[in-house]
Structures are given as C-alpha cells and as structure tokens.
Amino acid sequence: GSSGLISFPRN
C-alpha cells in the first residue's frame, strides 16, 4: 500500500 509516494507494496 502506498503512503503518498508512488506505489510501494508496503509502507
């Protein structure tokens, strides 16, 4: 799940 950046699998 992305936290605000691009689209990471975690964070």
From Swiss-Prot:
> By its UniProt entry, which InterPro entries does this protein fall under?
Periviscerokinin
Top-level taxon of origin = Eukaryota
Which residues does the record list as Asparagine amide (modified residue)? Answer: 11
Q: Where in the cell is it found?
A: Secreted
Could you name the Gene Ontology cellular component terms for this entry? Answer: extracellular region
Keyword Secreted listed: yes
Q: Which family does it belong to?
A: Belongs to the periviscerokinin family.
- Its job: Mediates visceral muscle contractile activity (myotropic activity).
Stated name of the protein? Periviscerokinin-1
Q: What lineage does UniProt assign to this protein's organism? A: Eukaryota, Metazoa, Ecdysozoa, Arthropoda, Hexapoda
